[in-house]
A protein has these predicted regions:
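Vicinal oxygen chelate
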Residues: 2-19, 39-91, 97-124, 135-141
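Conserved active-site tyrosine of GNAT-family acetyltransferases
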Residues: 28-33, 102, 125-128
Length: 141
């Protein structure tokens, strides 16, 4: 049986982007743009609201889609949108800068040092998803 790396050596994965499903896309876009400097690169209206948006900063990208938009998209998308909140784990260079930027956000896990060498904080975004910001303080992984 061929090894997986031989079978996939010509298969290039360009990126993986999470899609977060929410009731209201606008406050989530505002959170990432106003607090963390992301840029909205794509927006798709859904009636008089935003149904979908892509946010980007450098080579980091995430997408938000409203439940209403997901229901109209496809059966698979609609089904995925019905599952609880997602946790995003975001590695950063300077956690103190992030803490200043997210001041006022709902903290779900205060700053802590982990056994795996990070200093991290977890907050809830306006859509209810958990975002953990982590800075490696020991040897890099």
């Amino acid at each position: 049986m061929p090894r997986a790396e031989e079978e996939t050596e010509n298969m290039t994965v360009k990126k993986i982007t999470p899609v977060l499903f929410v009731e209201d896309v606008e406050p989530c876009v505002k959170f990432w743009m106003d607090r963390l400097g992301f840029e909205k690169t794509v927006e798709v209206p859904e009636g008089n609201k935003l149904g979908f948006a892509i946010l980007q900063k450098g080579n980091v990208e995430l997408m938000y889609q409203s439940y209403v938009s997901a229901d109209k998209d496809s059966a698979a998308t609609s089904q995925a949108a019905g599952k609880g909140p997602t946790l995003l784990y975001v590695e950063v260079e300077n956690l103190n800068e992030i803490i200043r930027a997210i001041k006022g956000a709902e903290v779900v896990a205060p700053v802590r040092e982990t056994f795996y060498g990070t200093r991290e904080i977890s907050v809830k975004d306006p859509g209810g998803h958990i975002v953990t910001f982590a800075q490696f303080v020991g040897a890099q992984h």
